Amino acid sequence: SKAIVDAKKGAIFTKYAKLISVAARKGSDPTINFSLRMAIDKAKSANMPKENVERAIKRGAGELGGAQIEELIYEGIGPAKSQFIIKCLTDNKNRTASEIRHILAEVGGSLGSVLWNFELKGVILISAEELKSKNLINNDDFELELIDAGIQNLVKENALLEARYYIG
């Protein structure tokens, strides 16, 4: 049972190490690089050792040897003309492209251009309690600020504020 727990931890740590490495390519300083800061926070919440985090940052920044992990986006068409945008982290583009092609082919799909049919949107979820506890701004003023900032859809549900916006 210890071996099973260790294997699960190892898989989680590997996942977070890849996320940290990819984020570190945009800059190795977490105070400036928000995506790196978020990846580090997620890794810490999973109790990933500090040495592993630092090694992943160095690998992403190019300070260590070994294969570079890259983020790739594939577009595919699946069964019943369903459309997919597939984001991958990989150290080998050719192997990943082959695997994606194979997976799509197994269900009668193929790689194809579908990105034109999607809009890139962001979603912000804010707890009303958290907003109130910080005493930064009242809810109504905050909602007005979001609308002024270009939020397209604002939904209040169960003390949670959801804001959707177009990234363009």
Model-predicted regions and their roles:
Residues K9-I12, Y16, I32-L36, P49, ...:
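Helical mechanochemical/support elements of P-loop NTPase systems and associated helical scaffolds
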